[in-house]
């Protein structure tokens, strides 16, 4: 069962409570390239991104935040490290949320300056703890970025913001070690009702990043923890968005758009099952209809294994059996089985 947290409004998206888990990504174009950031932001929005993070290393870079915000209709988060004045500049241009890293934002007076700016404009703050940049005194206490160390860092800054009479808060507590990250989120979720942004940081190259994020983010969601997610990949941010939705699908969250399933094939396969599955998925990109499509390798187990699919085919030599909701309907034959199958999908 999902652990319900308090609601926080980020621009036109509300997280927490019973609201859907929001998928987030972060632009990776150099901040000086405003045109490139705007173009990438538009691609992320088209891919379905719901919350978009943009780095802001200095106050002058707030102009990039402003340009991106004016170009898209999704909330923009300013990612702030070291320079608290960058956060102040982003608040001035109307950013929708500010992320601060407790490990490098500076002393309490600087945090208060950020809080005051956000309070005036009703801008939420994400306390973004990262296992790679914990405060020195906390690392000295625990000897490593343990779950307990990360939770202590997060809660200290939560209490600090609360001391300044600010509770418009989101928390993340990321680590590159999946078991450590998961335990940290468990401990944190048990002691706070602020919404949680879940992710595995520095997850690695594309393939390993997918695996670690699938395990870490998916595992947390299955335990009912998580209100917004980001899949951190060494790839274009649009790929992070796609992966985020796939994780939500995999753990049973309702997601708009088709899901294509296929079997791994074996020696019984007599038609290009994998190629057809990949092409079906490609052709259905951008489709918002929530359907499950199955492309199975043979008629022995195909219809049974995919009985929960809305529509599917199970192939043989030069033909494929079309089935809908697990029931065989007719045979597709000839050299254009794929096109015939797509026609049937579009009829649904």
Spell out what each predicted region is.
Residues 1-26, 119, 282:
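N-terminal amphipathic alpha-helix/helix-capping segment at the start of soluble metabolic enzymes
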Residues 18-36, 55, 74-82, 138-151, ...:
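Active-site mouth loops of central-metabolism enzymes
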Residues 21-27, 52-54, 76-80, 98-100, ...:
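Hydrophobic faces of well-ordered beta-strands that scaffold small-molecule active sites
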Residues 34, 45-69, 99-107, 169-178:
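Glycine-rich, proline-tolerant flexible connector loops at the mouths of alpha/beta enzymes
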Residues 59-80, 113-125, 185-196, 280-282:
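Alpha-helix-loop-beta-strand connector modules within alpha/beta enzyme cores
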Residues 71-74, 92-98, 119-122, 189-195, ...:
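Glycine-enriched alpha-helix->loop->beta-strand junction motifs that scaffold or abut catalytic
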Residues 85-126:
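Hydrophobic or amphipathic alpha-helical targeting/insertion segments
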Residues 130-133, 138-285:
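Catalytic alpha/beta core domains of metabolic enzymes, predominantly
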């Amino acid at each position: 069962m999902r652990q319900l947290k308090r609601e926080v409004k980020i621009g036109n998206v509300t997280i927490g409570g019973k609201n859907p888990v929001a998928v987030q990504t972060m632009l990776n174009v150099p901040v000086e390239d405003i045109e490139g950031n705007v173009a990438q932001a538009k691609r992320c929005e088209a891919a379905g991104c719901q919350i978009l993070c943009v780095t802001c290393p200095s106050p002058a870079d707030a102009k990039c935040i402003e340009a991106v915000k004016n170009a898209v209709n999704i909330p923009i988060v300013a990612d702030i490290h070291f320079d608290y004045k960058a956060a102040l500049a982003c608040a001035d241009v109307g950013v929708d949320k500010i992320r601060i890293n407790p490990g490098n934002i500076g002393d309490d007076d600087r945090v208060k300056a950020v809080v005051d700016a956000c309070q005036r404009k009703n801008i939420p703050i994400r306390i973004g703890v990262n296992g790679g940049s914990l405060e020195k005194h906390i690392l000295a206490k625990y000897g490593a970025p343990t779950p307990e160390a990360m939770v202590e860092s997060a809660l200290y800054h939560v209490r600090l913001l609360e001391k300044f009479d600010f509770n418009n808060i989101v928390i993340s507590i990321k680590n590159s070690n999946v078991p450590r990250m998961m335990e940290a989120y468990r401990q944190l979720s048990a002691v706070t009702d602020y919404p949680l942004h879940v992710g595995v940081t520095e997850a690695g190259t594309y393939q390993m990043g997918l695996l670690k994020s699938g395990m870490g983010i998916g595992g947390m969601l299955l335990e009912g923890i998580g209100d917004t997610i980001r899949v951190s990949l060494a790839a274009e941010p649009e790929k992070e968005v796609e992966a985020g939705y796939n994780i939500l699908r995999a753990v049973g969250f309702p997601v708009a758009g088709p899901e294509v399933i296929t079997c791994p094939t074996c020696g019984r396969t007599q038609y290009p099952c994998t190629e057809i599955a990949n092409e079906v998925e490609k052709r259905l990109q951008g489709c918002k209809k929530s359907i499950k499509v199955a492309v199975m390798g043979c008629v022995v187990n195909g219809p049974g294994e995919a009985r929960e699919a809305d529509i599917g085919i199970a192939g043989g030599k030069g033909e494929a059996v079309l089935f809908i909701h697990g029931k065989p309907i007719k045979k597709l034959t000839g050299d254009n089985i794929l096109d015939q199958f797509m026609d049937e999908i579009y009829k649904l």
